């Protein structure tokens, strides 16, 4: 599912809302999650999961094409840990 499909589904399930309002809400939620992660905060959606940022240390990598050693800079990457309700649903256990 992509963002536009999510917006369409939510609009269909909530006919009292205009699609452009649903789009604003979805975009606002994503922006708030991104802003919180950029600030170094953890975002927890109970039952669904938690988003956080992990630091990857600098390291020496290898170019797979040439075999040459390359320096990979330190970076921060998003991390998602699925919540219990999500894991249970994916494994066929209804909650």
UniProtKB/Swiss-Prot annotation:
SUPFAM superfamilies: IHF-like DNA-binding proteins. Pfam families: Bac_DNA_binding (PF00216). Keywords: DNA recombination, DNA-binding, Transcription, Transcription regulation, Translation regulation. Heterodimer of an alpha and a beta chain. The keyword DNA-binding applies. The keyword DNA-binding applies. GO terms for biological process: DNA recombination; regulation of DNA-templated transcription; regulation of translation. NCBIfam families: hip, PRK00199.1. GO terms for molecular function: DNA binding; structural constituent of chromatin. This protein is one of the two subunits of integration host factor, a specific DNA-binding protein that functions in genetic recombination as well as in transcriptional and translational control. GO terms for cellular component: chromosome; cytosol. Belongs to the bacterial histone-like protein family. It comes from Jannaschia sp. (strain CCS1). This is Integration host factor subunit beta.
